[in-house]
């Protein structure tokens, strides 16, 4: 058995994976193509370069990503340690000096005696234990290799996702359960609109601000993923023949067809999350909350994952990966980072942490670990490998992914505190054996 692991990509996930492997006494060949070849978004040769915001989001345990960070601290995360050491004032968030942060991660990983760095582009997947963590801007050559490995239908180049909501925040008195024409089981929650409600929603939608596209994302709308706001601007009634079509969705309370209907579809196996069908969007997040809360039943909706449209190379993890981040068709191959369908800096690093632990265990001949759904780390791994493979889209950490508490706690902050307490206690117990 080889006593090394190849890690391709020294971003957040790859750097974390390399650290976790190296600290377990296994040699790491870490490949990073920068500065030999840059992506359209990166500017330095440092590991874990943050190309967008300098915030790793909330630190408080009343937020799922705060719980995720705390779990990672208990598992000796290099990324979170570097973030803590290079933090800048940001209220309740963990924000960093991006240059200091990247330098910290680079020094920490590069100087580990078990890590050897190769600054070159990897164009084919090497033999032997390997973690692929090349991120959303994977090079064209490696993308072709991945397409060959996974099958073209399982590799995506754009992330076009509708908002995802907490079911508990939906006003169930204003919606009804029904499938179009009553075909099959009643699988959708339907939000009926009057003409007046539709007009108000339409005007807000076409007036809302969108996120500016980066130059390398300009072709995204030609990929068959039309944003709801672009559709609306093509004509006031365009949406009524598309995602808001009311035909076959008569309201059982009135027996009449609404003027328009917004459908919500279950997004996770537990039924705690719902997505807005056909509402992929490029609106700014604040505008999404304001506009989509005009939909009847969603006035108090909690959005756990905002709609996004951007360049993002990722695989269909429910079809291809195990919750260990291991590739189903090659036991010594692992994936990590945004390529797996986790969304966000911290989530990417967390996936690298698990992939790194498991790659090291694989080399040692030890049983691989699947972290429990009671933890933020484990719930993400479970979600991306078990959700509906036909409608799979990337997801960030949220309490809706964690295993149900088994008791109903109405107060949201108290409920989140209970999720956090259980998650951290679980990680503390598990960490002793990792």
Curated annotation (Swiss-Prot):
It comes from Bacillus pumilus (strain SAFR-032). The keyword tRNA processing applies. One of its GO terms (cellular component) is cytosol. Its EC number is 2.1.1.74. InterPro entries: FAD/NAD-bd_sf, MnmG-rel, MnmG-rel_CS, MnmG_N, TrmFO. The lineage of its organism: Bacteria, Bacillati, Bacillota, Bacilli, Bacillales. GO terms for molecular function: flavin adenine dinucleotide binding; tRNA (uracil(54)-C5)-methyltransferase activity, 5,10-methylenetetrahydrofolate-dependent. It comes from the Bacteria. This is Methylenetetrahydrofolate--tRNA-(uracil-5-)-methyltransferase TrmFO. It is found in: Cytoplasm.
